[in-house]
């Protein structure tokens, strides 16, 4: 059984369905590439998937270690290059609502930067990841 199904709807838009859950989303080409920008672009999803994967893996590590990271927010920005058109950099800033010891921070940060999506992307794509904690 496939993981998902994607259908081209026309007008530079796709609709995707997650097979197991039935959840759907659309993509729309960005305004700088002939689209309407009415939804995530495919490259937006790549950048967002990286942050989602990092949050998920940090969640797994936090569960194993009795930590709580609920409410942690990721701000994601991507930079595009040309010739060929591609993502050149993904910048992610994580904002934790709670503080952690240095050892706990290292554990969470190592988990994030080693997530499966991070390790699957080209080494040509710069991943700039910053972690922000409340001031003590």
Where are these regions (language model features)?
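Extended beta-strand/beta-hairpin segments
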Residues: 1-48, 59-136
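Alpha-helical metal-binding/catalytic segments enriched in His/Glu/Asp
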Residues: 53-54
């Amino acid at each position: 059984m496939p993981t998902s199904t994607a259908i081209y709807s026309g007008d530079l838009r796709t609709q995707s369905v997650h097979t197991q859950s039935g959840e759907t989303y659309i993509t729309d080409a960005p305004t700088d590439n002939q689209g309407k920008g009415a939804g995530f672009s495919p490259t937006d999803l790549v950048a967002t998937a990286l942050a989602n994967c990092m949050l998920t893996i940090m969640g797994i590590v936090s569960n194993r270690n009795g930590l709580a990271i609920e409410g942690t927010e990721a701000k994601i920005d991507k930079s595009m290059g040309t010739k060929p058109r591609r993502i050149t950099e993904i910048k992610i800033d994580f904002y934790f609502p709670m503080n952690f010891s240095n050892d706990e921070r290292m554990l969470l940060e190592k988990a994030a930067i080693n997530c499966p999506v991070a390790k699957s992307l080209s080494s040509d794509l710069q991943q700039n990841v910053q972690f922000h904690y409340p001031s003590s």
